[in-house]
Structure formats: C-alpha cells, structure tokens
C-alpha cells in the first residue's frame, strides 16, 4: 500500500508473435551490494528480518540501503529477473530465462488505491479505467492458471485446497489518530503478485537444486491450536 518503502517486486509484460507474451518478474537485489562480513551484512545478520507493527516497522536493512535498492517509480535499479514466455491460449509456460540486470520502474501500483476497481467482475467484463489495465488483464488469467496448477500439486500430496479470501488490515497512524482499513487477501492484484512471486521462487529453487546449491525458503504455516 501507500506506506510501503521496501518495494521488492515488479512485473513487465511484452506482447510477442503467435499469441505469446513475455512476462518479467523482477525482484529487488540488495545482496548485489552487500559483501559478506561488511557493515551492512552485520546489521542484516543481527536483525534477521523486518519487524512489522501497526503503523510502523523496523527494516532489516538500513534506510539508506533500502532507498538504494527498492524499486520506486521512475527508478533504475538492480534486480534479479525471471522472464517467462507464455502461450496465451493455454497459459502454459513454454520457456524461461534468468538475468541479473538493471530495470527501469515505470509505475508503482498501490493496493489501497486499486483493489476497489481491479475486481474479478471488472476483469471479466473489461470495465473500469485504471493504470496498466491491459497488462493486468494479461497477468490475471496467468495468475489463475498458476494458482490452479499449484492446487493440483497440493492434491497430489494429499493436501487441502487453499482458500484465498481472508481479510487483512492496514494501519495508518497520524499523531494520535489511527485508521484501520480492511484488505481482502486473494484479490486479483494480490493473487497476481503472490503467484508470480511463488513461480520465481520455485523456478529458481529448482535451478539451484539442479546445481547442488542450498536454498532456504521462508514459510508461514498456521498451526492448529491444541486443546
């Protein structure tokens, strides 16, 4: 939302011939500017993670480093990019490639301003007017296809289907005034961001596995209450 300072992912869309599209998943890469054992590395190792709290946070990296590597509108920043070639008729991925590169960020899209108009109904009918409407319309069916593919894989492992739609909350603190607004998890923009990030993680995880390189995933598992 509007309070986000660590903008760590961006997407690009390029139309190709034969009803194909090239989608880029660009992940901020501050590690490219950190040397093992240097001062920034020591701070990151001590903090381990960004700490979130209502209306505030303590970032894992110093503010100056965040500013240098976040992906702001109008900024040219280093990123690790996954490019996928997608058949738009089937939503199948026919090729992938990975690059460490500089990317120019044209726009920052905010959930708090777009979730209300980028709805399932608006995407189905083509209604509404919002930034990058055509690109979002291309990414939406891809995200749905990626989600369904993951659910089929979960079923193969005997796991239950994921049910998106939980409500999250944003906190805005201005002096002594606190505003709490609901945010629905599983909205189209939320699903697009989640599925493309998961795709990048799984693709790069498989690549590292193939080359015998260790890879650590962060998980957010909900534990059932004992009773």
Residue ranges of model-derived segments:
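Electropositive polyanion-binding surfaces
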Residues: 1-227
């Amino acid at each position: 939302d509007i309070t986000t300072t660590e903008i760590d992912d961006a997407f690009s869309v390029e139309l190709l011939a034969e009803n194909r599209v090239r989608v880029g998943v660009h992940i901020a890469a501050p590690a490219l500017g950190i040397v093992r054992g240097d001062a920034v590395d020591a701070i990151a190792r001590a903090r381990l993670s960004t700490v979130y709290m209502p209306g505030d946070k303590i970032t894992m990296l110093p503010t100056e480093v965040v500013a240098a590597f976040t992906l702001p509108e109008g900024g040219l920043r280093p990123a690790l990019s996954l490019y996928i070639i997608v058949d738009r008729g089937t939503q199948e991925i026919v090729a992938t490639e990975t690059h460490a590169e500089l990317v120019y960020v044209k726009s920052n899209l905010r959930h708090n301003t777009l979730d209300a108009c980028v709805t399932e109904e608006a995407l189905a009918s083509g209604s509404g007017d919002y930034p990058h409407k055509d690109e979002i319309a291309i990414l939406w069916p891809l995200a749905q296809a990626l989600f369904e593919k993951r659910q089929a894989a979960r079923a193969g492992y005997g796991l239950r289907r994921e049910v998106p739609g939980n409500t999250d909350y944003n906190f805005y603190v201005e002096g002594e005034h606190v505003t709490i607004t609901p945010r629905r998890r599983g909205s189209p923009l939320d699903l697009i961001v989640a599925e493309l990030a998961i795709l990048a993680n799984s693709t790069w995880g498989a690549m590292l596995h193939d080359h015998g390189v260790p890879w650590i995933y962060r998980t957010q598992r909900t534990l059932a209450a004992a009773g």
